[in-house]
Amino acid sequence: MLSSIYNDKCKHLIIVSYQLPVSLKKVNNKYEITWKNSRSSIANFREIDSNINKIWIGTLEEDIPIEDRDEVESLLKTYNCIPVFIEKRLKYKFYYNFCKGLLWPVLHYSIPLTNDVNYSKNWEKYWGSYYVVNSLFVKKICIFLEDKDTL
């Protein structure tokens, strides 16, 4: 059983994904959290043996105002979720421009063909957003990563 392997050698199983497996909404000035439906591929990790201590690190679909972030982070900790807050504009450049616009086609064998010499130059500005977002994830991981954790 997976838990026997991890309990002997691992303190926590830290699951890092772009998005956390939860949804968040504000009702009557209070945030409510629900697990995303099980059709989400990342949500399937919730099914890993309950004896394994899991910590989730990732972003939320929802944009959280700066003044609400401490409250949201506290609520998410009750779900073993650690948010990486990314500003909306940076998130867009990272996800839609670099990941979906460049990485996804390259990794799925649909490399765009073009004679436009400026095409590759445009990616340089999106590389910066990719680098910054990954740095935010690394900083958050380093805060919570402990000896004997599995990442």
Which role fits each region the language model picked out?
Residues 1-91:
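N-terminal low-complexity, Ser/Thr- and acidic-residue-enriched intrinsically disordered segments
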